[in-house]
Amino acid sequence: DKVTCDFMNTSWNGLCMEDQRFQAVSIPMKNTRMTLVLPGKGVSFDQISSTESIREILELCDPECTKWKQGLVKLSLPKLQFQSDMDLIPMLQEMGIRDAFQEEKADFGCIWQENGKETSEPDLYVSQARQAGAVKVDENGCSVASYTEITIKESMMIPDIKMKMKCNRPFIMILSDDQGTPLFAGAVSRIE
């Protein structure tokens, strides 16, 4: 299916390369560069996205790569904007990191501190690991944002003591800092 879209057009004297499999250009930017790789005519995207081809394409990102030639580059590029959101747990498990995600096997004792002192840690485990990113390319340049979020939860052991507390009559409330110093104290005498 063909889609109609606006293209940004530019030309400059810069780095480019071409062989039977693909064309590539290197676009200089402030403190970085963008490399664009386009499959050659009659070459499928799958052919240039094989592991071997990707290794060769990644070599183009090396500033010392000798495959680049200096030339007049005329580029037509559509405006781009896309986002991704990926669950990292399956990939991390495939890399051999498994115990961190299991309540009964995770061991984060080496990083657990309370009030600046090592203590016996609660049962912590990684409940979520995500990475999200966004890329936007337009006339103003390229902007990229990315973040990784790892959520660590405390597994709940069912305690021997059970208590039910319903604050439906006057009660006292005290807010204190982590040193135990009261910051605010008050009494709730009437609930409306």
Locations of regions flagged by a protein language model:
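Hydrophobic-core positions in well-structured secondary-structure elements of globular domains
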Residues: D1-E192
